[in-house]
Amino acid sequence: MRFKTRISNLYTLTRLVQALDKIGRFCWLRLMPETVNFVIVPDFRMTQVWSVLEVETIFEDYVVQSNADNVINLEVPIDNFYKALRSAANASDSTVRLSKKNNQPLLSLSTTWSGRAFGSNIVTHNIPVRVLSQSYVSVIKEPTAPEPDCHIFLPQLNFLRHVVDKYKSLSDRIIMSANMSGELQLSVNIPSARVSTKWKGLENPELDPSQVEDISRHPSQTRAPEEFVHMRLDSKDLVNMLKISSVAKRVIACFCEGHALVLYVYITDPEDEHTAVLTYYISTYVD
């Protein structure tokens, strides 16, 4: 089993791990010849987070070898990984490799620091990890969801977080509603009161014809644009997701009525050469 690579895009990798650090303690890091997966499947909630990146998005001189079709699965403590990446911010070169010490697998991040007076200096952070068997990870599947009934860009997450923080004290369920006319609403219904906050003038992203066979028959196109789709969500799930407000550049929310709220969280700018996206699957609740 062998893994070694240079980090070519430290900024994007650091932002990705920073976002994950706000969600859970450990992530499943799946290293494959063409792609790198970061996955969080919390045991205590029904929300899952998946990110699939092409290798060249963050790495170069990439080598991964194993007896399992050159796939390596690791359980990585996110906080330790994030701290190591953050410390490498101004390094001239950074590499990551899988190593072992006293039978403990390690993810070793080595950073090179160049100075005029004393030449180069190399600092290595060793992060204890757990190697996951293929049989263990084979039962973890990315959720599937039907085509969305509504898709909309969310407003700035800081604004949403402010509202959700207030509403969670009123109820453990928050209703998120949206339509194809650029409207989004958060509301709480309790016996003593009904409170809501509405945003207007948001953008509904266009569907990609290469991804949708017949756009005219897509669920988001067959209902009236002003008709709302309602999702009843756990307030804790929303609070957990909104912790990434400091690193998210833009978020597309896909409302799959009766199934799940799927959120595509972009942590890179549209003009960036490579795109890094986190996909959240948040289960909905039926009254």
Curated annotation (Swiss-Prot):
Chief localisation class: cytoplasm
Gene3D superfamilies listed in its UniProt record: 3.70.10.10
Pfam families per record: Hus1
GO cellular component, one term: mitotic spindle pole body
Keyword Flavoprotein in record: no
Phenotype caused by lack of the gene: Cells have a nucleus that is cleaved by the septum or the septum divides the cell into a nucleate and anucleate compartment.
Presence of keyword Cytoplasm: yes
Compartment(s) where it occurs, according to its Swiss-Prot or TrEMBL record: Cytoplasm; Nucleus, Nucleolus; Cytoplasm, Cytoskeleton, Microtubule organizing center, Spindle pole body
InterPro entries xref list: Cell_cycle_HUS1, DNA_clamp_sf, Hus1/Mec3
GO BP: cell division; double-strand break repair via homologous recombination; meiotic DNA integrity checkpoint signaling; mitotic DNA replication checkpoint signaling; mitotic intra-S DNA damage checkpoint signaling; nucleotide-excision repair; telomere maintenance
Chain positions with Phosphoserine modification: S210
Protein family (similarity comment): Belongs to the HUS1 family.
PANTHER family noted in UniProt: CHECKPOINT PROTEIN (PTHR12900:SF0), MITOTIC AND DNA DAMAGE CHECKPOINT PROTEIN HUS1 (PTHR12900)
Subunit structure: Interacts with mug40.
Official protein name in the record: Checkpoint protein hus1
Organism: Schizosaccharomyces pombe (strain 972 / ATCC 24843) (Fission yeast)
